[in-house]
A protein has these predicted regions:
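N-terminal cap/lid segment of alpha/beta-hydrolase-fold proteins
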Residues: 50-80
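Gly/Ser-rich "nucleophile elbow"/oxyanion-hole loop immediately N-terminal to the catalytic nucleophile
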Residues: 131-173
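N-terminal twin-arginine translocation
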Residues: 23-28, 38-53
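N-terminal secretory signal peptides
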Residues: 1-24
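Primarily recognizes the serine-hydrolase "nucleophile elbow" in alpha/beta-hydrolase
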Residues: 155-204
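Short amphipathic alpha-helix adjacent to the substrate-entry channel of hydrolases
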Residues: 99-118, 122-123
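Short beta-strand element of the alpha/beta-hydrolase
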Residues: 85-93
Length: 204
C-alpha cells in the first residue's frame, strides 16, 4: 500500500459506516468536508455543537521551537504558573492544527497537563486552505516523511522539558493521520503511553 493510499484510507475511515462509532458529529462534519474544504464544512456545525474550553487559568497559545534549524510552530497549553507537569503530545488530523486540536490541548491543560500540538506539515505547507482532499494529500500529506515527524516530536518533548514539563511522565494521542503517528512514536519508547483515535496500523 502506498503512503497516498494509506492517507486516503485514513480519511475514508472517518466516514459513517466505516467505523464502529457511526453517526458521530465529527465524522459527519468530516464527510461533508470532501470537495468543499474542512473549514467551510465544519464551521456551521462547530458554531452549534462544539465545546470551547476557556483559557482562563492557563498559559495557552502559539509557540515555536527549533528542530534542525527550522522553527516548528505549535500550539501549547498548560496550567499557569505550574511546573513539573506531565506532558501530552496532541497530534493533528490531515487538516492540521485547527481549533478542535487547540481546544483538545486546553482540555488537557485543565486536567493538569502541558499539552503541545506541533504543526507537523509546516515545512510542506498549510493544509487549512485546501478545498480538494486528493490535492491536499498529493501536495502536502504524502510529502511529510516519518523521520521528520519523529524529529519534530522529539523537539516538542525537549521544549516541554525546558518549559515546566516532566517528560518522564509523557504521553501521546492523535486523530486519523495522527493516530498512525501515535503508534510510530510510542514505539520509540520516548513516551509512557499512547492513545490513537482511528489511526492505521499499516502503511509506510
Amino acid at each position: 500500500m502506498s503512503l497516498r493510499d494509506d492517507s486516503r484510507s485514513d480519511f475514508d475511515s472517518l466516514r459513517p459506516g466505516e467505523s464502529t462509532e457511526q453517526g458521530a458529529t465529527r465524522r459527519t462534519a468530516l464527510k461533508a468536508a470532501i470537495g468543499v474544504g474542512y473549514a467551510a464544512a465544519v464551521m456551521p456545525v462547530v458554531a452549534q455543537t462544539a465545546v470551547s474550553t476557556s483559557a482562563e487559568g492557563l498559559k495557552a497559545g502559539p509557540i515555536k521551537y527549533t528542530v534542525n534549524g527550522f522553527e516548528v510552530p505549535a500550539y501549547a497549553a498548560a496550567p499557569a504558573g505550574k511546573t513539573g507537569l506531565p506532558v501530552i503530545l496532541v497530534i493533528q488530523e490531515i487538516f492540521g492544527v485547527h481549533e478542535y486540536i487547540a481546544d483538545t490541548c486546553r482540555r488537557f491543560a485543565k486536567l493538569g497537563y502541558l499539552a503541545i500540538a506541533p504543526e507537523l506539515y509546516a515545512r510542506q505547507g498549510d493544509p487549512r486552505g485546501y478545498t480538494d482532499i486528493p490535492k491536499l494529500q498529493a501536495d502536502i500529506v504524502t510529502k511529510v516523511p516519518d523521520a521528520q515527524v519523529m524529529a519534530d516530536l522529539d523537539g516538542a518533548l525537549a521544549y516541554a522539558a525546558a518549559n515546566g514539563g516532566n517528560v518522564a511522565k509523557s504521553g501521546i494521542t492523535g486523530f486519523c493521520w495522527g493516530g498512525r503517528i501515535v503508534w510510530l512514536y510510542a514505539a520509540t519508547g520516548k513516551v509512557k503511553a499512547g492513545v490513537a483515535w482511528y489511526g492505521r496500523l499499516v502503511g509506510q
